[in-house]
Amino acid sequence: MQLDIIAVGQMRGAGEMPLVEEFHQRIEASGRQLGISGLSIIELREKRALTGGDKKRSENALIADALARRSGPLIVLDETGTSLTSRAFADKLQGWIERGDSDVTFVIGGADGLDDAIRGRADLVLSFGPMTWPHMLARVLLCEQLWRAISILTRHPYHRD
């Protein structure tokens, strides 16, 4: 199973980048035990020249285009979504693995968020709590939680209850 993250914006050596790279390596190394073939991060260009609704529509069109080539479960990150414990998230991942899904796609929108059409396609709208997170930090949180879920499923000592 392939894990894909589609995210608006590009990491440019920011402080978050080393964290994403570290969790990416851990996911790829330990995920093999579970049948996870890898993690891809697809960065979509942020539309800085546009504002408001035009920016959101343009970025969401890029996301929709990227999703056209995906067939597995779609999980979008949105502050209005469902909050899960790390164990519940690991259970979701286990379910996708057991079901034999070939890929699972996570979407992180830009600063103006996701439109209803993208959220409506989601199998799960996931929230990291009611607070608003910068999309670059949301990427770190998602990578960490993917690694944590894998560590729970492989009984690695990283996660402690």
Annotated model-derived regions:
Residues M17-V20, S86-A90, R119, R139:
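Conserved strand-to-helix beginnings and helix N-cap segments that scaffold or border functional pockets
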